């Protein structure tokens, strides 16, 4: 019985070391947890029609925390959880016409800014 405990403890220790090593290399996509950083990514659908079209994609900051009692009193509809977030949006873009008459935005620079779709 003691032999199995030592064996299990050794396996768990090796597993923890391996997981720590994998998380130490954030530049590799297969080891990344969650979402990649905010940056330009080619839109394959619109790029098939000619010149490459880029869009901003990735993650920025977000957090949720309990709403303070003082703030809850001033809310029209009190909520227990308050959240803050910033989204990956285009800092600069150019309007491009593809396939004759379809106008799209070709993003040229990205940054983390206010999430407009969260506003009501």
Swiss-Prot record:
Disulfide bonds: 35-59, 38-88, 56-110, 60-112, 87-115
Residues glycosylated per entry: 80, 106
Biological process annotations from GO: cellular response to hormone stimulus; follicle-stimulating hormone secretion; G protein-coupled receptor signaling pathway; gonad development; luteinizing hormone secretion; negative regulation of organ growth; organ growth; positive regulation of steroid biosynthetic process
GO MF term (any one): follicle-stimulating hormone activity
GO (cellular component) term, any one: follicle-stimulating hormone complex
One Pfam family this sequence matches: Hormone_6
Keyword entries, A-Z: Disulfide bond, Glycoprotein, Hormone, Secreted, Signal
First and last residue of the signal peptide: 1-24
Predominant location: secreted
Matches recorded under SUPFAM superfamilies: Cystine-knot cytokines
Subcellular localization, as worded in the UniProt entry: Secreted
Family the UniProt entry places it in: Belongs to the glycoprotein hormones subunit alpha family.
Known partners and oligomeric status: Heterodimer. The active hormones thyrotropin, lutropin and follitropin are heterodimers composed of CGA, a common alpha chain described here and a unique beta chain which confers their biological specificity to the hormones: TSHB for thyrotropin, LHB for lutropin and FSHB for follitropin.
PANTHER family in the cross-refs: GLYCOPROTEIN HORMONE ALPHA CHAIN, GLYCOPROTEIN HORMONES ALPHA CHAIN
Function, in words: Shared alpha chain of the active heterodimeric glycoprotein hormones thyrotropin/thyroid stimulating hormone/TSH, lutropin/luteinizing hormone/LH and follitropin/follicle stimulating hormone/FSH. These hormones bind specific receptors on target cells that in turn activate downstream signaling pathways.
Name of the molecule in the record: Glycoprotein hormones alpha chain
Species for this entry: Cavia porcellus
